[in-house]
Amino acid sequence: LRYIYSDISGHYDDNTTAGNAFAADIACYYNNYLMMGARECQLSFGVNIKNIGSKINYGEDYSYFIPTNLGLGLSYSLPINEYNRISFSADANKLLVPSKPLQMEDETNEAYEQRLRDEYYDISSIKGMFTSFADSERGFKGEMEEIQWSIGAEYVYNDKFSLRAGYHHESANQGNRKYFTAGAGFRLNVL
């Protein structure tokens, strides 16, 4: 359970106040060892829903959604021999917040603001989580574009040294973040 305090205006705007909200997470993790020939492999799966909670208000006549997120992850670890191990991982994330309706060409600003209040801001945070799966104006393709995914691999030698690399992908319509990652690590025993 978490308490959220957000003061985005920094007291520079007299028309807004600090926002307050509460949120919680739900997570599930499964881990199993499988025999692949003579090798004992590890298969792991996890699900996490983060920031399930209230909406946040900054002193206006409507509240904003906090970034509720659904994450799914899968990992497979394969021992090569007594000293070497390689792991492969995949991860998918989707924001569980409804898409804000777009303003229609013939719609006045006042009519659009009223439609936002009726169709977007008045939705509860829990209802918003469920409607986020079917609210894209681009249909199923748009819903699939809302999913960010990542893949990665890690090599470990003697549980002492590791090398890892990965790739993250986000649709151009959702922010267009695409990047590779790399890293190394070592275990150091200290008295």
Each predicted region: which residue ranges?
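Outer-membrane beta-barrel porins/channels
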Residues: 1-191
